[in-house]
Regions:
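Carbohydrate-active catalytic/glycan-binding domains of CAZyme proteins
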Residues: 1-156
Length: 156
């Protein structure tokens, strides 16, 4: 899948390692999966891609996914190819993903004082105590100086 790859996220599920990566096969980016028993030797999943750009806001692709396991529900946070928003998809098996109907849940206009007015990219989610934090890169407006932003959300 794709002519090159970018960004990855690895989780351990059912005694296997699942590696999610962005496959760059222009004109559209997609998220693919490779699986390993030992975390060293990976085999591409034959049903790739596991996440495609099928919503209007996703434009020419999806990528840079990061995965969280919350009580057996996998959550993938990903961005669109033009770096204008983030989406979320859920799965119970790591292969079949359901996108939220609230996507994009975060966009460039969601940032404080619009400081990332041009791009938001590379979402990374960390749970600290009872708080879920979304870290991301942002730049703008029109400066192209990468900055790190954070969004806090209390868990239920």
């Amino acid at each position: 899948m794709g002519t090159s790859t970018d960004s990855l996220s690895i989780i351990k599920l059912n005694n296997q390692y699942y590696l999610y990566y962005t496959g760059r096969n222009l004109p559209a980016y997609k998220i693919g999966l490779a699986v390993s028993q030992d975390g060293i030797n990976f085999t591409k999943y034959s049903g790739n891609p596991v996440l495609i750009n099928d919503q209007s806001w996703e434009l020419s692709g999806v990528g840079e996914g990061t995965i969280q396991n919350e009580n057996g529900i996998l959550k993938m946070y990903y961005m669109n190819s033009l770096e204008t928003g983030f989406g979320i998809a859920t799965s119970t098996n790591g292969i079949n993903w359901t996108k939220s109907n609230l996507n994009p849940f975060f966009t460039t206009s969601s940032t404080y004082n619009n400081w990332a007015g041009d791009h938001v990219s590379y979402p990374s989610v960390v749970k600290v105590n009872n708080e879920v934090r979304l870290y991301y890169c942002g730049d703008g407006p029109s400066t192209y100086e990468h900055r790190i932003g954070m969004v806090r959300k209390l868990s239920n």
